Amino acid sequence: MFLVGSLVVLCGLLAHSTAQLAGLPLPLGQGPPLPLNQGPPLPLNQGQLLPLAQGLPLAVSPALPSNPTDLLAGKFTDALSGGLLSGGLLGILENIPLLDVIKSGGGNSNGLVGGLLGKLTSSVPLLNNILDIKITDPQLLELGLVQSPDGHRLYVTIPLGLTLNVNMPVVGSLLQLAVKLNITAEVLAVKDNQGRIHLVLGDCTHSPGSLKISLLNGVTPVQSFLDNLTGILTKVLPELIQGKVCPLVNGILSGLDVTLVHNIAELLIHGLQFVIKV
């Protein structure tokens, strides 16, 4: 009986202690276990919680490569631009003896330009007083590239810009004209007798209507003089510049990287379309 009574007293004391402890706060880290994946948030920078999306690095899908034909077209135009510049195109344009060509009628005093100049100088005496016409500040602008509808040819647009300094004492100061002209070169792929593939130059000429001449600065001359001078330049300049650019393009094509030539030629021979930005 004494043993049973002692157990009853002990159980009562334990129940009383448990009731008292239930009202006290639990020590840090001794809380009841939480369900899986619901752990307490971690503190970050003055109590801010770290969002789940910023907690772990996310896998990033690799970027898709560009279309190979886009890269091929860019490499081709870059090679042409670099070849024209390294071939001295800008210096060649600056050294064109434009006044001598105009006065000689393009090397043929009996030709169209020579006859035209003779008529103009007789009707507009100011043209006789031209002391010099100098090409300055030649620029090679960004090349354009398109493919023929059948896929067998490329057409390269070579845009040029330059300034003409016209020295005329009668006018009273230097007259400057801004000139823009596009040369268009046709490129084809051919196979020789040994089966080797080459890129060759087809037609190469100035684009009709692409020549633009405008008064840049200087004393405004008599309008008839400006019109007649522009008319002469329109007859002379395109063929002069074309004669300098086209041989350079032909030489560049023959010296292009073999792999680049092969890749482009294969597409042209089979008529496969490039993805080319105009």
Curated annotation (Swiss-Prot):
Record flagged with keyword Hydrolase: no
Leader sequence segment: 1-19
Self-association state and partner proteins as the record states: Monomer. Interacts (via N-terminus) with SCNN1B, a subunit of the heterotrimeric epithelial sodium channel (ENaC); this inhibits proteolytic activation of ENaC.
Family, similarity comment: Belongs to the BPI/LBP/Plunc superfamily. Plunc family.
Organism: Mus musculus (Mouse)
Cross-referenced Gene3D superfamilies: Bactericidal permeability-increasing protein, domain 1 (3.15.10.10)
GO MF terms, alphabetically ordered: lipid binding
A GO-annotated cellular component: extracellular space
Keywords: Antibiotic, Antimicrobial, Disulfide bond, Glycoprotein, Immunity, Innate immunity, Lipid-binding, Repeat, Secreted, Signal
Entry-listed glycosylation sites: N182, N228
Function: Lipid-binding protein which shows high specificity for the surfactant phospholipid dipalmitoylphosphatidylcholine (DPPC). Plays a role in the innate immune responses of the upper airways. Reduces the surface tension in secretions from airway epithelia and inhibits the formation of biofilm by pathogenic Gram-negative bacteria, such as P.aeruginosa and K.pneumoniae. Negatively regulates proteolytic cleavage of SCNN1G, an event that is required for activation of the epithelial sodium channel (ENaC), and thereby contributes to airway surface liquid homeostasis and proper clearance of mucus.
UniProt tissue specificity: Detected in airway epithelia (trachea and lung) and in bronchoalveolar fluid (at protein level). Upper airways, nasopharyngeal epithelium and thymus. Highest expression in the trachea and progressive decrease from proximal (bronchial) to distal (bronchiolar) airways. No expression is detected in the terminal bronchioles, respiratory bronchioles or lung alveoli.
Predominant cellular place of this UniProt entry's protein: secreted
Keyword Secreted tagged: yes
InterPro entries, sorted: Bactericidal_perm-incr_a/b_dom (IPR017943), BPI_fold-superfamily_member (IPR051902), Lipid-bd_serum_glycop_N (IPR017942)
Region (4 X 6 AA repeats of G-[LPQ]-[PL]-L-P-L) location: 23-52
Compartmental location: Secreted
Protein name from the UniProt record: BPI fold-containing family A member 1
Repeat repeats: 23-28, 30-36, 39-44, 47-52
Location of region: Important for surfactant activity and antibacterial properties: 112-117
Cysteines engaged in disulfide bonds, as pairs: C204-C246
